[in-house]
Curated annotation (Swiss-Prot):
This is Large ribosomal subunit protein uL10. The keyword Nucleotide-binding does not apply. InterPro entries: Ribosomal_uL10, Ribosomal_uL10-like_sf, Ribosomal_uL10_bac, Ribosomal_uL10_bac_type, Ribosomal_uL10_CS_bac. It comes from Vibrio vulnificus (strain YJ016). Disulfide bonds: none annotated. Belongs to the universal ribosomal protein uL10 family. One of its GO terms (cellular component) is large ribosomal subunit.
Amino acid sequence: MALNLQDKKAIVAEVNEAAAGALSAVVADSRGVSVDAMTTLRKQAREAGVYMKVVRNTLARRAVEGTQYECLTDTFTGPSLIAFSNEHPGAAARLFKDFAKENKKFEIKAAAFEGALTDAEVLATLPTYDEAIARLMMCLKEASAGKLVRTIAAIRDQKEAA
């Protein structure tokens, strides 16, 4: 389907707006993936707060121009599916990684975080906000328990020395 200039400008503006407010971006090649599988992926993306769109490469290059995802311009070759994480930096990468396990033809091309290309595996393994808080609380709890054990051991040693 041919797009006129106004449609192209609208697509570039839409993707640029999504890129401006995103925490991370992932580019993938979805050739050979069934329509049903892609529909499921789009539904999961909406639920995870991920903006996802198939965009022509020239329009994608123009859309990310001047944003922190300008580093992705070289990856826009062949069919490109671009996803921007809005709520959590690892959401799109985690979604694509899980989807690629089920669909062997789905290939993750690149990922970007804070203006630099990043390994999608690293982005996918980032803990969510709740997981990070839980880990922090666990560390604090272990530290205070360890301090208590050392204090009791010091008191025991003092009594033995006396």
